[in-house]
């Protein structure tokens, strides 16, 4: 514990909150261009080939973003919209690509949870 004299000399520093999605720079979403589209494997105990993209954002950051849903049409130079939200079993993946906007097509034949995958209501 510091003495009063030490506190007078050097005041206590407030603890700074760490942002969970710093690359968005306080915006709800950011536009970016895919630099690379590939698959990675999740950490234990899960097993899969998860689709991710390396995205260069308009804020200047290059991030790894998860591509949600079954099948996708993304390739290098695709323009995508990125939102925050991590993927628990993929270390370093702290962003999601928004489906159904810009170059990311919506998920085909999706009936439930459509809003998360950019699918319009069926007539």
From Swiss-Prot:
Record Gene3D superfamilies: Nucleic acid-binding proteins
Keyword list, A-Z: Chloroplast, Plastid, Ribonucleoprotein, Ribosomal protein, RNA-binding, rRNA-binding
One GO biological process term: translation
Superkingdom as given in the UniProt entry: Eukaryota
GO cellular component: chloroplast; small ribosomal subunit
Protein's cellular compartments: Plastid, Chloroplast
Main location: plastid
Gene Ontology terms, MF aspect: rRNA binding; structural constituent of ribosome
Keyword presence, Transmembrane: no
Task performed by this protein: With S4 and S5 plays an important role in translational accuracy. Located at the interface of the 30S and 50S subunits.
Subunit structure: Part of the 30S ribosomal subunit.
Name of the protein this chain belongs to: Small ribosomal subunit protein uS12c
Originating organism: Pinus thunbergii (Japanese black pine)
């Amino acid at each position: 514990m510091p003495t009063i004299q030490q506190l007078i000399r050097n005041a206590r520093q407030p603890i700074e909150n760490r942002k969970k999605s710093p690359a968005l720079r306080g915006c709800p979403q950011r536009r970016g261009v895919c630099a690379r589209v590939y698959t990675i494997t999740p950490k234990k105990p899960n097993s899969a080939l998860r689709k991710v993209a390396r995205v260069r954002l308009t804020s200047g950051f290059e991030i790894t973003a998860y591509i949600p849903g079954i099948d996708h049409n993304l390739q290098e130079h695709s323009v995508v919209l990125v939102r925050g939200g991590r993927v628990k079993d993929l270390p370093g993946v702290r962003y999601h690509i928004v489906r159904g906007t810009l170059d990311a097509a919506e998920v085909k034949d999706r009936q439930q949870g459509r809003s998360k995958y950019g699918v319009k209501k069926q007539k």
